[in-house]
């Protein structure tokens, strides 16, 4: 049953006479406390926060003085007391509330400055179970929720970035804070506790291997507001979850304009793809446009890999994203800047490479310090009308699969290497995906078609266009291998690849007509390998 309201109107301006400060993150604390004291605000505080304020010579009263109860149980219980929560929740112009405050000696609290134990930081640093549990804040969220609920009389500050605004408003309004400002702070406060609880619930789900918990929360902290979203009429923001997976969200931007919504989406796709290639074994480069690869290649050097990737589709690569699995060096940088590129993302960049890229002031250069683990568990989420689709991350890696040769002819060692390469790439191409590969480089990519046959034909045509642009007598699909992200439902998709010149095929298998497809491969002397794993991508 819903709780009814007495409909007591909130004052526009409410005088701040008393503040409670209890923070884990002490950024800006002392200057803020000094400003509150200068504005005539009495300061209450807890534990380490009180000690820091007192050490700075600022008058402060420990919360135990108003509760009459010391901190106990290693600080687990210190603010869970009616003297604190009554002061936060009391409706100041309700006679019954005022009478209760007087009867029990409860003083009102007009400003609650609270931030929480660093649970998210401990979680993503891989703290042990007991340490992570100990960093679940109880009293902090309770005070935040209490004060934010009572925003008619209490201002709630959960972010040190808001200290300056609070001081400015106090000085502007002679020691009071306006209702609109208090509402804004309350909204942020509830967002903070929601995100905090989401992090805790998601961690617990992971800890007990619960893949589909009854309640699922996805939360993040605003990192930046985009100029616009996918299109200019859409608004957008970039939120960070706190996960330390190397990538665009955790990268350091060394130069260039602010990343756009599309830049971030494409850069993430590019870096996740290139991470499929072990940098200890090979240098690899992926060029991405609209979240699909234009070209991917491996070689002994980043420069060589880039040139091979670029050759796959140099027209589409214009204005694309370039991702590397090794450090960006001078030789590679000199080649990349010859083509208009939006973003370069790499584990690192030499000083010489940075100097070369600096000549293109709008080119964004990101370094990550490492590569994401393609085998790591994680979630992928997508919104639908009225719901949220959540699935585990596609962390299947072709090197871990039991590949089965299903044709009379087995692939050669060179073909098998290219087949694995092609399947790695196909995992990151929008379905239906067909990828032609030769000598460690894509030579044709067909993406996002409703018909697998059409994807095969588009990939072949792309290869023909690239060959013509390079002055080659024949497209590089002659003698190539082909990967399909899902099974061939009919032999026609395979025959399109054969017509393009493919000599070996890798696909998941699992079609009712696998026998027909295998027979067609045998008829044309094609080697076929089945993986047993599909890589649809929508």
Curated annotation (Swiss-Prot):
Transmembrane segments: none
Alphabetical GO biological process terms: 'de novo' IMP biosynthetic process
Catalysis performed (reactions): (6R)-10-formyltetrahydrofolate + 5-amino-1-(5-phospho-beta-D-ribosyl)imidazole-4-carboxamide = 5-formamido-1-(5-phospho-D-ribosyl)imidazole-4-carboxamide + (6S)-5,6,7,8-tetrahydrofolate; IMP + H2O = 5-formamido-1-(5-phospho-D-ribosyl)imidazole-4-carboxamide
Pfam family, one: MGS
Pathway in which this enzyme or protein is active: Purine metabolism; IMP biosynthesis via de novo pathway; 5-formamido-1-(5-phospho-D-ribosyl)imidazole-4-carboxamide from 5-amino-1-(5-phospho-D-ribosyl)imidazole-4-carboxamide (10-formyl THF route): step 1/1; Purine metabolism; IMP biosynthesis via de novo pathway; IMP from 5-formamido-1-(5-phospho-D-ribosyl)imidazole-4-carboxamide: step 1/1
EC annotation from Swiss-Prot or TrEMBL: 2.1.2.3, 3.5.4.10
Keywords on record: Hydrolase, Multifunctional enzyme, Purine biosynthesis, Transferase
Entry similarity comment: Belongs to the PurH family.
Primary gene name: purH
GO cellular component assignments: cytosol
Protein name (record): Bifunctional purine biosynthesis protein PurH
InterPro entries per UniProt: AICAR_Tfase_dup_dom_sf, Cytidine_deaminase-like, MGS-like_dom, MGS-like_dom_sf, PurH-like
SMART domains, per the entry: AICARFT_IMPCHas (SM00798), MGS (SM00851)
Annotated domain remarks: The IMP cyclohydrolase activity resides in the N-terminal region.
Entry keyword Transferase: yes
Molecular function per GO: IMP cyclohydrolase activity; phosphoribosylaminoimidazolecarboxamide formyltransferase activity
Domain MGS-like per the UniProt entry, residue ranges: 6-158
PANTHER family per the UniProt record, alphabetical: BIFUNCTIONAL PURINE BIOSYNTHESIS PROTEIN ATIC, BIFUNCTIONAL PURINE BIOSYNTHESIS PROTEIN PURH
């Amino acid at each position: 049953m819903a709780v009814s309201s007495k409909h007591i109107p909130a004052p526009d301006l409410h005088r701040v006479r008393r503040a409670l400060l209890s923070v884990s993150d002490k950024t800006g604390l002392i200057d803020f406390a000094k400003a509150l004291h200068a504005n005539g605000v009495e300061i209450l505080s807890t534990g380490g926060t009180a000690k820091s304020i007192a050490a700075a010579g600022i008058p402060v009263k420990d919360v135990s003085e108003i509760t009459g109860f010391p901190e106990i149980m290693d600080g687990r219980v210190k603010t869970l007391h009616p003297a604190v929560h009554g002061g936060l929740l009391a409706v100041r112009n309700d006679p019954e509330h005022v009478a209760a405050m007087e009867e029990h000696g409860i003083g009102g609290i007009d400003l609650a400055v609270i931030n929480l134990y660093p649970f998210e930081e401990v979680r993503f640093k891989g703290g042990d179970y007991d340490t992570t549990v100990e960093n679940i804040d109880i009293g902090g969220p309770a005070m935040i929720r209490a004060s934010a609920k009572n925003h008619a009389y209490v201002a709630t500050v959960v972010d040190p970035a808001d200290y300056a605004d609070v001081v400015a408003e106090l000085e502007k309004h002679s020691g009071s804070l306006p209702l609109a400002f208090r509402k804004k702070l309350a909204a942020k406060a509830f967002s903070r506790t929601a995100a905090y609880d989401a992090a805790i619930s998601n961690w617990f789900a992971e800890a007990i291997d619960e893949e589909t918990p009854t309640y699922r929360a996805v939360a993040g902290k605003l990192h930046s507001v985009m100029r616009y979203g996918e299109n200019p009429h859409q608004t957008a923001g970039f939120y960070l979850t706190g996960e330390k997976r190397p990538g665009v969200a955790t990268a350091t931007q060394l130069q260039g304009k602010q990343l756009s919504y599309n830049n971030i989406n494409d850069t993430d796709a590019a870096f996740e793809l290139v991470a499929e290639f072990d940098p200890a074994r090979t240098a690899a480069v992926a060029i991405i446009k609209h979240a699909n690869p234009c070209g991917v290649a491996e070689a002994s050097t980043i420069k060589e890999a880039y040139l091979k990737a670029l050759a796959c589709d140099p027209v589409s690569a214009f204005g694309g994203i370039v991702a590397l699995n090794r450090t960006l060096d001078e030789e590679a940088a000199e080649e990349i800047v010859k083509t208009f590129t939006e973003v370069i993302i790499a584990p690192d960049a030499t000083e010489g490479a940075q100097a070369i890229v600096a000549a293109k002031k709008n080119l964004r250069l990101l370094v990550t310090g490492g590569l994401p683990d393609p085998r790591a568990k994680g979630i992928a989420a997508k919104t639908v009308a009225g719901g949220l689709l959540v699935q585990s991350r596609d962390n299947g890696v072709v090197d871990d699969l039991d590949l089965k040769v299903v044709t009379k002819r087995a692939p050669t060692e060179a073909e098998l290497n290219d087949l694995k390469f092609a399947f790695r790439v196909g995992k990151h191409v929008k379905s239906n995906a067909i990828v032609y590969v030769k000598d460690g480089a894509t030579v044709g990519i067909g993406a996002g078609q409703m018909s697998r046959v059409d994807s095969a034909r588009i990939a072949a045509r792309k290869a023909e266009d690239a060959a013509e642009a390079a002055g080659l007598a024949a497209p590089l699909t002659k003698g190539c291998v082909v990967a399909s992200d899902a099974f061939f439902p009919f032999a026609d998709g395979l025959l399109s690849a054969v017509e393009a010149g493919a000599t070996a095929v890798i696909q998941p298998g699992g079609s009712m007509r696998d026998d027909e497809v295998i027979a067609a491969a045998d008829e044309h002397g094609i080697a076929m390998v089945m993986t047993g794993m599909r890589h649809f991508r929508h």
